[in-house]
Structures are given as structure tokens and as C-alpha cells.
């Protein structure tokens, strides 16, 4: 994965994780998963609801927070 992708994904997912924001995750096959992001790395997201599911990022189409969030960008990161 490109560094640019990580610069966008990591702050977004980390904010959702830290603030315990409920999310809906839509997979490329149309399935909707709901829960809170427990953890993530370069390849997977751990989504916690009644159980914890490991969801591969390549299977994710869209991540929709249940409420608006403000993403904290580190110095030097642009929004291009």
C-alpha cells in the first residue's frame, strides 16, 4: 500500500478507535458490518460488536462513522 494511503487511513481509523465511535463498514460484496474499531494495521481492521471480527481491508468498500469526527493530522501531512 502506498504511503499516501496510510497517511489518510491511519488518522481516520485511529480517531474512530480512540473516540469509540460506532461505525458501519460496507464490504465490496455489499454486506454491512457494525461495531467499534478495536484495532487496525496495514492489512486488517478488528471490529468489535458482540464478538470481535477481523476484516481484511481489501474487502472493505466504505467506512461510515455514526457521527461526525474531526481527524487530527500530524504536522507535514497535507490534504491533497
Curated annotation (Swiss-Prot):
> What's the gene?
hfq
Annotated Gene Ontology MF terms? Answer: RNA binding
PROSITE patterns xref list:
SM
Q: Where is the Sm domain?
A: 10-69
Alphabetic keyword roster: RNA-binding, Stress response
Q: What is a biological process (GO) this protein takes part in?
A: regulation of translation, ncRNA-mediated
The Gene Ontology CC terms held by the record are:
cytosol
**Which N-terminal stretch is annotated as signal sequence?**
none
Matches recorded under InterPro entries: Hfq (IPR005001), LSM_dom_sf (IPR010920), Sm (IPR047575)
Q: What superkingdom heads the lineage?
A: Bacteria
A Pfam family of this chain: Hfq
Could you tell me which CDD domains the record lists for this protein? Answer: Hfq (cd01716)
Q: How does it assemble?
A: Homohexamer.
Q: What does this protein do?
A: RNA chaperone that binds small regulatory RNA (sRNAs) and mRNAs to facilitate mRNA translational regulation in response to envelope stress, environmental stress and changes in metabolite concentrations. Also binds with high specificity to tRNAs.
This protein's name: RNA-binding protein Hfq
What organism is this sequence from? Azoarcus sp. (strain BH72)
